[in-house]
Amino acid sequence: MNDTLKYYEKDPIYKKYIHNQITFSMAYFYSENFILPFSHDEVVHMKGSILNKMFGDYDTKFALVRNLYAYQFAHPGKKLNFMGNEIGSFDEWKEFEPISFSVLDYPKHQGLQRLIRDLNLIYENHSSMYVEEYNPKHFSWILADNGDQSVYAFKRESEEECVIFVFNMTSNFYWDYDLGVPYPGSYEEILNTDKAVYGGWNQYNGLPCLTYGNGIHNQKYKITFKLPSYGAVYLVYNKKQLIDSKKPSLGKNENNTATIL
């Protein structure tokens, strides 16, 4: 995850020049069974805490660290986080001092802790985030080369569902972001790191996103949704929609008896 942290440290103006630091991990991911660690080694010996590594001012650092953890949970592979990362400690780890839980007196830190809790719940309740994660058939990029916008998107699938993960790595806000998706129907937002409960500006998608028009990004269909600054969005598609759409509907003939259409 070293390349990942270096990417998040970078000024967004220059991120398009190091765009592949995020995509490169999937080029070799299936060669071994990887763990994704933000371990103690990243937050000692004058390296700074995870939060302090992030680019920008106070609000931007928190927005980016929320994005970072959403990316870690979305990425295939088992997760590992060192104690204190989940509350957004500003101090790096000191082995002879306790973790600075006093930061939880402040709303931004409370929001980050709540996000980590919800990420764990989402991970537990959505099979596409852990079933067959070392099988390349269950992952594919939707947006891997959009360096100009520094937006990434990929999908992970299980038999029951498909989850779309989208990450905006700059301060640009998109009211109507178009994204290609693989299946027709409704995509429900299950995570938005910009929600106020996480310390964000509450720019989220309250209604399901419905497919329409022609597909883009080498996908058959398209949705439009709100993509906040430095935001990460999870959209889930329940594959039961595919089954229901293939079921014959019942109509009535002239004798008022049911007939299959």
Outline where the language-model segments fall.
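Extracellular glycoside hydrolase catalytic/binding regions
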Residues: 1-28, 35-37, 49-60
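Carbohydrate-interacting/catalytic domains
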Residues: 15-17, 41, 46-47, 58-62, ...
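Flexible, charged surface loops at secondary-structure boundaries
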Residues: 28-30, 158
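Short glycine-/polar-rich loops that comprise or flank the Walker A/P-loop
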Residues: 32-34, 78-79
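Extended, charge-rich helix/loop segments that form flexible
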Residues: 33-43
